[in-house]
Amino acid sequence: MRGWIKLLLLLVYLASFHAYYRERIEALGIGLPLVLYLGMFAVLALALLLAAFSRPGWLRWSLALAFTVSAIFLDAYNRITDSYLTYSAFVSMVYAGGFVQEALQQYHYAITLAAARALLLLFGLGLRPGPTPRLPWLLPPVAPVLGLLALIAILFVRAGEGARGLPVMYTPLAYLSLFGYETLHDHVGPRQPVTLAQAGPAMARDIVLLIDESISGNYLDLNTPAGVTSHLGQAQPGVSIVNFGYAASIANCSADTNVTLRYGGTRTDYLRINSTQPSIWQYAKRAGLGTVYIDGQRTGGNLQNLMTETEKRDIDQFIQFDDTPVVQRDMAALERLVALLKDGRPQLIVVNKVGAHFPVHDKYPDDFLKYQPALPRGRYVDIADTGTRDGFDGRPQDWVLYRNAYQNTVLWNVGEFFRRLFAEGDLSQAVVLYTSDHGQDLHERGNPGLNTHCDSDPVPEEGLVPLVVIQGEGLRTLDWQAHLQANRNASSHYNLFPTLLKLMGYDGTAVSALYGRSLDMPTDDPFTFNVRFNARLGAKPDFRHIDLGQVVTPASVLAGQPMPVGKAD
């Protein structure tokens, strides 16, 4: 009797994904691919049912736990993003592990639903089966392993593709196996030393790369009149502000963008460059600059965005804010930046701000509650990197609350940040390059899902970021105005690394040959961001072009009719 109950639990669990299977069947249509899909589905489903009859309890429960955790991962991802988990997206999730606490808090409702459904799988596999059919004793525990190996083989030869529509508990385990294999075997060579020649000294005493978090270019007033006040669109005493308008990010996930900003990967060769070429820190030290990293996101010395201990050794000052609440982290980073700008030392300063990464419930003080109604506040103000998602399930009204909370956060962590920087900072000997790691999908179009970025099939806003140069008014650095008209709304993150190297005094011709065009040249950028950054096993990157005519702005949302950038304001 217990055996039949177990089978019923597993069949009910499998059947609960009927819409997932139907979508795949409809996409394949009638033909050989459908036959192959149905055959693989039958093999994996049968292997799962056989696993339920494994005799050793420890083995049965081990299989149950592994499959359950895997199923929860994929089910929750599908609920959150309303899209399929590709292998590239899986790798990006692994690299974004530093945000796991925020993700659990942000998406706890979707994860809870996935976990509740997975209880059917857990008990269907784990409960003692009782009397079993006459089966070879090795078949039940070996069958799911063989099924998993078969799926891994398919994914390997198809560059990570081929699991769509199959029983969900196998896919993340197969992805994890492939990722482990690649980690062990993919080595493109050792890190190289700096070989570029310098044409002269650094052009400024302080060179600053200011990387915001989750700040979408279409929500700031410097590009959209109805956007949030940034203080970047108005003249400021003693400084020159050059607005390059909208820019394309490297990718729509933090780790992918940040590691490329630090190593200078190009669209055509980023995997090799990021893995083997010198870091921005190495270039700075060769140019005679000190190196400072201000990390507002992590604490306790924990590294993120694919930074390693080896890379960290080239950083002279590694700054985090262990005892500072999240809501004050960007202001703490500002205070340290202001102090560094005044110390008279030549240095490269890279800042990772808190910005507006989810959750945004409590990332701004009460005085900045301008956009209302907003998400509920006050429950986690003393806990770093957490927030609440109670009552948020992705309905249109929920996204209204989210967008308002997001704009309040931007008003504080961008607007107030720059107001204080211009008021307190000595920028007379500094050049600051400001951007964000990626944009945001705030679901202005009413598209389904709970996700804001890292989607495998994103809206263009996920790759849309601001790009601004700020420098002391009397400084003679690069000629930002030379090609500004052509480069405005037409450049990308890929232009930043060569710009930084030229500011450090490296030979421009050599820099361009290795890393591409800087912002003082016609960038001729394709204006794309990469949604398959972790292109593995022979797969190709997937660069998505941003059509500014399709980007939604706050003004169009307020008007109740999403409109193109060029027309909304």
What is the role of each PLM region?
Residues 2-11, 25-38, 51-60, 68, ...:
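Membrane-interface soluble catalytic domains
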Residues 148, 155-387, 464, 493-506, ...:
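Active-site-proximal alpha/beta segments of enzymes that process anionic O-linked groups
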Residues 264-266, 401-402, 477-484:
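Flexible glycine/proline-enriched surface loops and loop-helix/loop-strand junctions
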